Amino acid sequence: RPEYQKLRVLHERFPTVPRIALTATADQRTRDEIISQLQLEKARVFINSFDRPNIHYAISEGNNPKLRMWRFIQENHPQDAGIVYCLSRKKVEATAEWLTEQGRVALPYHAGLPQEVRQKNQQRFLREESVIIVATIAFGMGIDKPDVRFVAHLSLPKSIEAYYQETGRAGRDGEPANAWMAYGLQDVLTLRQFMQNSKADEAHKRVEHNKLESMLGLCELIACRRQALLGYFDEALE
């Protein structure tokens, strides 16, 4: 984010104040950029494992993603709490309504909803059992519900970092959890259009494009996706 680049000013004004930089998800290139932007070249770097062995990853391509997601939920999580991520607000609303019609408690969450509605839906998700929250990426920051048993993506995430961060909201209690995703060509075209229409400079757009291509590569992989996911963050699967 552009604002982060201005943080170096604090060090220039207060050079004797100790600093620490923390991030939950960053590949090597991003870590190098953080170090450079914050002028932390002499700092020590500590990296914990990215592996979440209790999460099972599944990625599905094909028609009728909504029906395939419903089959996944019914077969694996008929009474469990979960998160369904969608790319657009319209898709969030439609998916929450559809899941409700199927008999599940499904609540929408996106930035276009009134704040009181977002807070109410968030609190119900945190306090009640078996609630499914259907959301854009506006949902999740600071949310800590240990017993989320599944995270489903009905839209392709924009990067592996985003995918890892969003799926990482499942199974925080250490118990088995599922990360399920459906994707299609339209998702790729939509995300590319978003990137092309953004106000970012061309260098940033190239980085975002490369991240999307890496995400697409993970989807199309026929080998172990956990191994590829860890490899993206420069970690070998033991």
Model feature map: region roles:
Residues R1-E202, V207-N210, D234-E238:
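Helicase motor core with emphasis on the C-terminal RecA-like subdomain
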